[in-house]
Amino acid sequence: MIKKIGVLTSGGDSPGMNAAIRGVVRAALSEGLEVFGIYDGYLGLYEDRMEKLDRYSVSDMINRGGTFLGSARFPEFRDDSVRAKAIENLQNRGIDALVVIGGDGSYMGAKRLTEEGFPCIGLPGTIDNDVAGTDYTIGFFTALETVVEAIDRLRDTSSSHQRISIVEVMGRYCGDLTLAAAIAGGCEFIVLPEIEFNREDLVCEIKAGIDKGKKHAIVAITEHICDIDELARHIEQETKRETRATVLGHIQRGGSPVAYDRILASRMGAYAIELLLQGYGGRCVGIQNEKMVHHDIIDAIENMKRPFKGDWLETAKKLY
């Protein structure tokens, strides 16, 4: 019988994490459970930095970006002795289960705890939208708004100067954020990690646009594909059009979460408590077709594939 739970945020922060923590805390308290907030992710779990939370601990948090519990990358958590100490800390406080909010790296920590017999529920918190088992992750739509606003501003200055602008978007090895922002921002060209990149093909496409009378263009590209400053120089040399590169960087992770992320985070937080009370452990929560779902966390990490939004790309191509 679950009586006490812990909640932590891990890995890169995303807007809506505070709303998810709030959802976990308020839903747990409504069921008579005690909740402990764990500071700075798995590092704080290992160092036994925890604090009991009440409903006032999460007051005025739903609208805040980031995570008030803090987050830290802690690769040492892969070590068996480190995890053993973390589990000992949980057991010493009488904590029966753990809710982990983060991306696939955070899920890996929850997976290892699950394999060692400690019940965990994972909530997908990342702007990258790269977690299997869910259509969308907490923070994706807020980051999308941030990127689209930046693209809109760049278009203003690009059109004024008849310039080509390259915008680098976060996402690691997932192009969802870039693709969605490119559609919403009306970008002329899209470069994604899921599609093999050939810079000469891109140059040819840009030249074709210029030949048709295009005065300016926006190229949206996911991070880690190439050096965008070098790409900008090459495009400028080949097209004779001024070309500038912009890296949006960590601004994409910040800001007050949009309404959808607040709702999604709240639903997922409450659903995590529902699963724990039903006796589930070792699960990860997702949303599919607007319904809450859960999957085996080990299966999600090892076997499930995140589908590429090919239909979105086809739509984008029609609108170039």
From Swiss-Prot:
Domain of life: Bacteria
Activity regulation (UniProt): Allosterically activated by ADP and other diphosphonucleosides, and allosterically inhibited by phosphoenolpyruvate.
Gene Ontology MF terms in the entry: 6-phosphofructokinase activity; AMP binding; ATP binding; fructose-6-phosphate binding; identical protein binding; metal ion binding; monosaccharide binding
GO CC aspect terms: 6-phosphofructokinase complex
Keywords per UniProt: Allosteric enzyme, ATP-binding, Cytoplasm, Glycolysis, Kinase, Magnesium, Metal-binding, Nucleotide-binding, Transferase
Organism: Serratia proteamaculans (strain 568)
Any one of the GO BP annotations: fructose 1,6-bisphosphate metabolic process
UniProt-annotated catalytic positions: 128 (proton acceptor)
EC primary class: transferase
Residues reported in the UniProt entry to bind Mg(2+): 104
Catalysed conversion reaction: beta-D-fructose 6-phosphate + ATP = beta-D-fructose 1,6-bisphosphate + ADP + H(+)
General function of this protein: Catalyzes the phosphorylation of D-fructose 6-phosphate to fructose 1,6-bisphosphate by ATP, the first committing step of glycolysis.
Similarity annotation: Belongs to the phosphofructokinase type A (PFKA) family. ATP-dependent PFK group I subfamily. Prokaryotic clade 'B1' sub-subfamily.
Cofactor(s) annotated in UniProt: Mg(2+)
Binding site for ATP: 12, 73-74, 103-106
Subcellular location: Cytoplasm
PROSITE patterns found in the cross-reference section: PHOSPHOFRUCTOKINASE
Binding residues for ADP: 22-26, 55-60, 155, 186-188, 212, 214-216
Claim: Cell membrane is one of the keywords in the record: no
Enzyme Commission number(s) from the entry: 2.7.1.11
UniProt xrefs under InterPro entries: ATP_PFK (IPR022953), ATP_PFK_prok-type (IPR012003), PFKA_ATP_prok (IPR012828), Phosphofructokinase_CS (IPR015912), Phosphofructokinase_dom (IPR000023), PKF_sf (IPR035966)
Description of how the protein assembles with itself and partners: Homotetramer.
Residues noted as binding substrate in the record, renumbered to the chain: 126-128, 163, 170-172, 223, 244, 250-253
Protein's UniProt name: ATP-dependent 6-phosphofructokinase
Pathway this chain belongs to: Carbohydrate degradation; glycolysis; D-glyceraldehyde 3-phosphate and glycerone phosphate from D-glucose: step 3/4
